[in-house]
Amino acid sequence: MYSMLEHDMKSAVPPTHQSAQGMTQLNGGVTHGSAKPAVNSQQQQSSDPMDKVKRPMNAFMVWSRGQRRKMAQENPKMHNSEISKRLGAEWKLLTDAEKRPFIDEAKRLRALHMKEYPDYKYKPRRKTKPVLKKDNPAAKYPLSAGNLLAAAAAQGSGGSPRMDSYGWGHTGGYPGMQTDALGYSQQLHRYDLSALQYPSAMATAQTYMNGANSYNPMSYSSTPQQPSPVMSMVKPEQVSHSPTGAHSHQRGPLQGDLRDMISMYIPGGDTTDSGAQRGYSNIQQHYLTGTAPLTHI
């Protein structure tokens, strides 16, 4: 019984070994077959042999070949670029008679090169230059006009109050608007100077603009009406500048205007000065006692 089992086991082992050998042969064939296209692709990628051919040397290269070696031995720490600069300077100092043998040697080498490689064509290689970072003008000139305008635009449409006070106008305005603002500020200064020259006319204008203060010593509110600075500056332009009778000449039209104002508030009343004073006294009593005046009914 044991002999039969051993016979069965021995008979079962060789087929597995043969199958393993067959698999290795198949794998080997596959790998061998795949290696051939790789070799062919490398052969196809091989560049033209003419690309490896060097250009023939010119006269300077023929002369500098020996001089470069000599200078490198004398100065072992010198860089190759520095050696080339010095050799170029020395080559320019040579006379035509000294350059003649090297020029003839360069012609001979060129003729030999054309004979060996008749189909040779020089194909210069383009060197990739590193992209240089452009200098930012804003970094160089932080206080330029363009940067100031950009900073003002970033603050919004309102602009900077400091810039507006100097007559620049709103942010982003056109040059015409800016010139108008500058001209307006100059006009204000001109009116201001004229007001300083005529203080009596200035006082009369303030009295006309705030007529209630001339009749009523008390102010009706904590914030009384005050003439705007622009109107107080512009008003002296309209007043006659006669130095002799300026104040007496203006009282007539001013009183007429006050009568018109009184007639607006007190309809049907007398338009004389006494009626105006009674109307203002009644108004004062109204504000003091809180009762409505009945004289105008």
UniProtKB/Swiss-Prot annotation:
One of its GO terms (biological process) is positive regulation of transcription by RNA polymerase II. GO terms for cellular component: nucleus; transcription regulator complex. Residues 53-121 bind DNA. Gene3D superfamilies: High mobility group box domain (1.10.30.10). It is found in: Nucleus. The modification Phosphoserine is found at S160. Residues 1-52, 219-255 are annotated as: Disordered. Transcriptional activator. This is Transcription factor Sox-19a. It comes from Danio rerio.
